[in-house]
Curated annotation (Swiss-Prot):
Belongs to the STK11IP family. It comes from Xenopus laevis (African clawed frog). The gene is stk11ip. This is Serine/threonine-protein kinase 11-interacting protein. LRR repeats lie at residues 112-133, 135-155, 167-188, 190-211, 213-234, 237-258, 259-280, 284-305. The lineage of its organism: Eukaryota, Metazoa, Chordata, Craniata, Vertebrata. GO terms for cellular component: cytoplasm.
């Protein structure tokens, strides 16, 4: 709650809205280009003040304050504020977490409201919605709604019955706790866009049918098991449907959406491609997402998917983000031909050929077999005809016409069988068999299997599954011709051959499984909800093998269903009343629990109907109990290894209770359906939360005390490590997001970098103020991985390809990019302000005024402060182990932002209560980009905070400058205050007194001692700068200077007599240069060989820069004065390595 008086708060708001230079300027708010965002305590103070100023209470329509002295500035600003609120079209209300939930907020001043967004504000706390609901066009509620009725029908805290919302076209109720829809949607006649994602909706019912104008519907991240029902008007207008992360096992219902263009079914329970048969009618489909479904991991996933799509959508369809290739379309057509060539079995055959996986059972629905093209009504001519008729037909068949018919028949044959038509040439050349033709005329056409009633023909058939999406038959009438007869003959031959092979293979597999049975068949009745699962044929044989539980057809001995016993999670024996031949009996009931993604397959009940049911149950239990104990033991061992978690906020380590371990418990199933036990801020995606603080930011636990990880280790590679960095260093461990299937494993091998198929996730902040997640991926297109450990070798600072902290070795320089581990640490441990958001960060050596030495620091910038986090050790493991918060300064106190000499550093100065800092970037491009991003962040602040900022993009040289004595040309013909040209570079230096005869020898002087401070980057360390010391290189037209500076800096407004902070380390005339050496493999390194004729000694300057362009720039600076001295070409020596 703000501590200011209501009047002062209103004055401050009015001043903010009146400043046109501010990002929240009044004109931008009024024209709708900006959204007015207010905290609920602030709005409460403002509305209560206005209520006091209206003695008779607020009325309807636009209002003005009662008459007051015209020269009263507070009253004028209050009137301005009231006018602004009455004309504001877009409002966003944010309810802070520390405020009580019983907190009334009135929006009566907003008379022209068109868009309203509520964040974390309970609807019952909102007043005044009934006066504006009829004109609202956009309504957004985030983490505050538990039912639609309390907002749409009751108008929040007004508790009044609402009429239709006439103008509302966009409704966003995502990230809430909605469990069901209700009839309040009937009031949204004009709704076009609806986002109900990230809720707990299990069923939509028929409530969405009233939305006849709906064009976009997002129901992702819910618990839907079926496609929602829509009205006829909606089916014609809907173009985008998002159903990702649900529990859909079928697409039935999508065939009624002919104009659908964008469809997202990712991460559902679609087990087979046949479930996509409803997509064949979506001719306008442009984008389809199916990743994460069980069939997504099949080898020919894209081709099998394409065969169920409309051919009209092939050219323009994006499947999982990429266009279908020509080969995939061709493979899809080939798969389609194979499906059409498979014969249709009779009802008797289909009843015994259930799916041999645990995905389907005999009583479950399955997709119908595709109809053959030849299944059509045959219209025959009369078998007895007049002689004159036949003679006339024969006379009307000239030779030319017969030849033409042969050609057409050949072309039709080639079109039917494609490139393989020559294999069936014998069928084309052979004469048609008259007996076969006659028999084919009298035989009925084949049809797809259909449900049969076993009571009518119990001896020949058993129940068969009903088709999932029945379609009305549309027979095509055509006259039988010899061409059609030939096609039918060839097709029937192929069908018989293919069907025979499949039947033989299936029979052999079933015989192998039955031969492994551990017990005799037991007669049981599968029960579902207290009733037989298949009332027409209730009993089956139950058999157990080493790996499967088999349900078999008692008539023909065929396998109807099989379940894998390694997923068995529970056994329960009880009794159930059963009616046998009119007598009520108590029979044993065996309940088995399995681990499955489909809820209906998690539990199966069998009533034992054997002659001796008790002994049969005992035999089954004796076989199943050892298997159950083995499964539970393996599960416990895997949980011990894989589920030890750590909270990034409170550092608590705990073991995560995996949902699948509780599948056998009905309470756990109900708890999974209702994950709101811990409030509105629950993660709806199923992630775990910390039991201590409730935080969702958890990771796999780090290394334990003996150096082992909590996950199984891969075997250490026997290949020698490939370390690209000079020097030793212990292997350190970091974790990142991986796409590999074995993502829970840990890599204990040192010096192992992530493979190309793996990725690290970064977070960045865009200019609009929204968090974006950027995946730097070189292998795959989707993020489906998990946390994973890997080891990297380093020295001093972790190589940039391990943690990706800018500036690094990535292709693009963007200080907004930050590793996801570091982003979590900064959000949890560093940022402490209200509504404070991360913006950018930079790893850079920093010099703080008053401290002698520079140190590695992570400079993190938020929308409120700048944090200087000292890097105290190797970058690995928990960021809290190698990051120490040093100092922080408010952005509102920043008074000076100056770029150092020749963009080698950046100076930040704060007011009298703050400090002064120098960022030694040693790179012009890094300094320029980071300065630009700081200025962008400062532009978000109100104008009064950055209007007094003193900024300079270049450091000027005056006679009082510290470098003036070195760069001033005393031999110049005229005195001038403008200095001559010079080159100034911050780099790392190492001297060699004796030059090795081999110019390619190592750059490191083994006799040199490691300096106390070495802030060289990993790239410079790799190229030999480990023993170098930081210096400043100054090159004039005659000399080269090596200067030691402490880089202490104070703003001009606080200039004092600073002690001498610079001394000359060495000076060499350019004429002493004997040669200059560049190395292609070390772009940051430069060797300058020197020879002093007076002292007759040789030496070398070994230089390392942080900018790969600087070595060549130094060479070009030395070229002109050296050639002017010796009048010969100055050619550097370039080495490969």
């Amino acid at each position: 709650m703000p501590s200011e008086a209501p009047e002062s708060l209103v004055q401050a708001l009015a001043q903010i809205l009146h400043e046109h230079d501010s990002l929240v300027a009044g004109d931008k708010v009024l024209d709708g280009s900006r959204i007015l965002t207010l905290l609920t305590p602030c709005l409460q103070v403002v509305t209560r003040l206005f209520e006091q100023l209206f003695p008779r209470g607020p009325g309807t329509g636009f209002q003005a304050l009662p008459a007051h002295p015209a020269d009263s500035v507070p009253i004028l600003r209050a009137q301005f504020m009231l006018d602004m609120l009455q004309k504001t079209p877009s409002l966003k209300l944010v309810h802070p977490a520390e405020c009580p939930r019983q907190f009334d907020v009135n929006i009566f001043p907003f008379k022209s409201l068109r868009s309203l967004e509520l964040r974390c504000l309970p609807p019952h706390c909102l007043r005044g919605l009934r006066s504006v609901y009829s004109q609202l066009e956009v309504l957004i509620c985030y983490r505050c709604v538990s039912s639609l009725e309390e907002v749409i029908s009751l108008c929040g805290g007004d508790l009044s019955s609402a009429l239709p919302w006439l103008e509302l076209h966009t409704l966003d109720f995502s990230y809430n706790t909605l469990k069901d829809l209700d009839s309040s949607l009937e009031l949204l006649n004009s709704l076009k866009i609806s986002d109900l994602s990230h809720n707990q909706i299990t069923e939509c019912g028929s409530y969405l049918k009233v939305l006849s104008e709906l064009q976009y519907l997002n129901l992702g991240y819910n618990y839907l098991t079926a496609v929602p029902e829509l009205s006829i008007g909606t089916t014609a207008k809907l173009h985008s449907l998002i159903l990702r992360h649900n529990q859909l096992s079928s697409t039935c219902g999508l065939e009624h959406l002919p104009n659908l263009q964008h469809l997202d079914l990712s991460y559902n329970l679609l087990l087979e491609h046949s479930k996509l048969s409803s997509l064949t009618r979506l001719h306008n489909l442009k984008q389809l997402f199916l990743e994460g479904n069980p069939f997504f991991f099949q080898k020919d996933y894209r081709a099998l998917t394409a065969q169920h799509l409309s051919p009209k959508a092939f050219d323009k369809l994006l499947l999982d983000g990429s266009l279908l290739s020509g080969s995939e379309i061709m493979n899809a057509q080939m798969f389609g031909e194979k499906v059409r060539l498979q014969p249709s079995s009779s009802a008797t055959e289909s009843s015994c050929t259930g799916d041999l996986t645990d995905s389907y059972s005999a009583a479950e629905k399955s997709a119908p077999r595709l109809l053959r093209k030849k299944s059509r009504v045959k219209v025959r001519t009369a078998s007895i005809s007049e002689r004159s008729d036949s003679e006339y037909e024969q006379r009307g068949q000239p030779v030319v016409l017969q030849h033409q018919r042969d050609i057409e028949r050949t072309d039709s044959f080639r079109e039917q069988f494609g490139v393989d038509w020559l294999q069936y040439r014998s069928h084309l050349e052979s004469e048609l068999d008259p007996d076969y033709v006659n028999s084919s005329h009298t035989s009925p056409p084949r049809a797809s299997p259909s449900p049969t009633n076993p009571n009518t023909d119990l001896k020949h058939t058993s129940p068969s599954p009903a088709p999932e999406c029945p379609r009305p038959p549309s027979p095509k009438t055509s006259v039988i011709t010899p061409d059609n007869e030939l096609m039918e003959k060839v097709e029937e031959g192929l069908e018989e051959h293919l069907w025979g092979l499949q039947e033989a293979k299936k029979t052999s597999e079933e015989e192998g499984l039955i031969g492994e049975a551990l017990c005799s068949p037991v007669v049981v009745c599968p029960v579902l909800n207290g009733q037989p699962r298949n009332p027409d044929w209730p009993w089956v044989f139950l058999r157990i093998t080493h790996h499967f539980l088999l349900e078999m057809d008692p008539e023909r001995g065929r396998i109807l269903l099989k379940r894998e016993l390694h997923s068995l999670r529970g056994i329960q024996k009880s009794s159930a009343p059963w009616n046998c031949n009119g007598e009520e009996q108590e029979l044993p009931l065996l309940t088995l629990s399995f681990e499955s993604v489909c809820e209906e397959k998690q539990t199966v009940n069998y009533v034992v109907l054997d002659n001796s049911p008790e002994s049969s149950v005992t035999i089954l239990l004796d076989l199943l109990h050892p298997m159950l104990e083995r499964n539970l033991r393996e599960k416990a061992e895997s949980q011990d290894d894989l589920t030890r978690m750590q909270c990034l906020k409170c550092k608590t380590e705990f073991r995560h209770e995996v949902d699948r371990g509780d599948i056998c418990n009905p309470e756990s199933i109900q708890q999974r359906k209702d994950p709101t036990a811990k409030g509105l801020h629950r993660n709806h995606t199923g992630d775990a939360s910390c039991p201590s603080c409730g935080s969702l930011h958890i990771i796999l636990a780090t290394l334990n005390s003996i150096g082992e990880v909590s996950t199984p280790l891969r075997p250490v590679s026997t290949e020698p490590p490939q370390d690209n960095y000079v020097g030793g260093g212990q292997a350190t461990t970091s974790f990142y997001l991986s796409d590999e299937e074995d993502s829970s494993e840990a890599d204990s091998s040192p010096n192992t970098a992530p493979s190309e198929a793996e990725r690290t996730v970064f977070y960045s902040f865009d200019t609009e103020g929204q968090d974006q997640q950027l995946a730097m991926d070189t292998g795959r297109s989707s993020l489906t991985g998990s946390y994973k450990y890997t080891a990297l070798s380093q020295s001093g600072i972790l190589p940039q390809d391990g943690w990706q902290i800018s500036p690094g070795t990535t292709q693009t320089l963007d200080f907004r990019l930050v590793d996801h581990r570091l982003k979590l640490y900064i959000d949890m441990e560093v940022l402490d302000g209200d509504m404070e958001e991360f913006r950018c960060c930079m790893k850079v050596p920093v010099v703080c005024f008053g401290k002698a030495l520079e140190f590695w620091a992570l400079v993190a910038v938020s929308n409120q402060k700048i944090y200087f986090l000292e890097i105290t050790g190797e970058i690995r493991g928990n960021p809290g182990d190698w990051l120490q918060p040093a100092e922080s300064q408010s952005l509102t106190l920043l008074t000076h932002l100056h770029v150092g000499l020749q963009e080698q550093s950046l100076h930040l100065g704060f007011d009298s209560c703050g400090g002064a800092y120098t960022l030694l970037t040693r790179n012009q491009h890094h300094c320029r980009v980071f300065t630009k991003q700081i200025l962008e962040i400062l532009s978000e602040l109100p104008a009064r905070y950055h209007s007094n900022l003193q900024q300079s993009s270049e450091e000027s040289i005056t006679p009082h400058h510290r470098l003036w004595p070195f760069i001033h040309d005393k031999l110049g013909m005229a005195e001038s205050n403008s200095p001559p040209e010079f080159l100034y570079v911050l780099l790392f230096f190492l001297r060699e007194d004796v030059v090795s005869p081999n110019a390619d020898s190592s750059c490191v002087n083994t006799d040199s001692q490691l300096p106390l401070v070495n802030t060289a980057s990993p790239a410079a360390l790799t190229q030999g700068a480990r023993a170098a010391s930081p210096v400043s290189l100054l090159i004039t037209r005659t000399h080269m200077y090596l200067l030691e500076e402490d880089h202490q800096w104070l703003p001009d407004t606080r200039t004092n007599e600073l002690p001498d902070n610079m001394q000359m380390k060495e000076k060499q005339p350019i004429s002493n240069i004997s040669s200059v050496h560049l190395i292609k493999s070390a772009s940051l390194h430069l060797r300058i060989h020197l020879y002093n004729e007076t002292q007759q000694n040789e030496s070398a300057w070994l230089l390392w820069t942080e900018d790969p362009e600087k070595p060549r720039e130094i060479v070009e600076w030395l070229r002109e004065p050296w050639e002017a001295e010796y009048h010969i070409h100055f050619n550097p020596v370039i080495h490969d390595t």
